[in-house]
Amino acid sequence: MGFADTVTKAYMKDNTVFADAFNYLIYGGKAVVDPKQLQELDTTEIALPFGTQDAESKPPEEAVQKYRDVLKSAIIKQDDAAAYILLGIENQTDIHYAMPVRNIIYDALQYGKQVADIAAKHRARDGDAKGHSRGEYLSGFYKEDKLTPVITLVLHFGANEWDGPLSLHEMMAVQDPTLLHFVQDYQIHLIDPAKLSAEDLGRFSSSLREVIGYIKYSKDKERLSEFLTDNPRMLLEANAARVIKAVTNTPLEIPEGAEVIDVCKAVEEMMNESEERGELRMLVKLVRDGDLKLERAAEKARMTVEQFETVMENTPSQAV
């Protein structure tokens, strides 16, 4: 796993950020998913042939195993009703052109795991499934059993617009609508910075808004400067700053042990430092080309002549 994958995974595990992503996706930013009602789950998805798990609960050798990025259980309370669901996030720093298939596998494995778990409970409790039909006994899944719904969200941590397929049908070699009508489709849920408007960004309530906004404008210096200047919320937790640093290659200084980072100030200092280095290199070039006297260059750089001479000695010719 690369560094960017590691930091995005750590960031999205935060319940506040995780809930914010799904509140945006499902409820348009309304605070319905409560971070306090989220519980971390094992991200290992194992597909089992239904009803064949042995008495010791050991998966058979032909079991398929995959790993999600983040998976949490949630209790959604709305209008005096409560729903128990599973929420999964897949972080993508690069565009994945088979994402619909990948997500189908994750969701199918989770449903397969639920069926296997339910079947195992029935066997442990009922033994021979007395009072149930042969079909219920063979499948291990009873007529009244229900599955917990799974919603998987793809979060693109990249500045380029996602140009990969958003559905299984888009991936098919056949595009005949008559045939596709009988091919099951699967749509992915995607948050893509490049496609979000300023109004969309305003629907996020956590630092995810600043992270996604920074990524969105990271290739446009002028728009990024406007975003940073007009945003009073750029005092971010360290994990959010690490995501910005990793996925946009912004050389932010994040001191070890720091809990919050003033990203606006850090970027401003970085840009000022970059401008100062550029001006200093230009002065060195002018002196070397004979267009400016050493004493005058030192004065412009606010240095002594000796200090400027040291700078010249340590500045390679190819750097100016």
Q: Can you annotate each of these PLM segments?
A:
Residues 1-320:
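Elongated, amphipathic alpha-helical interaction scaffolds
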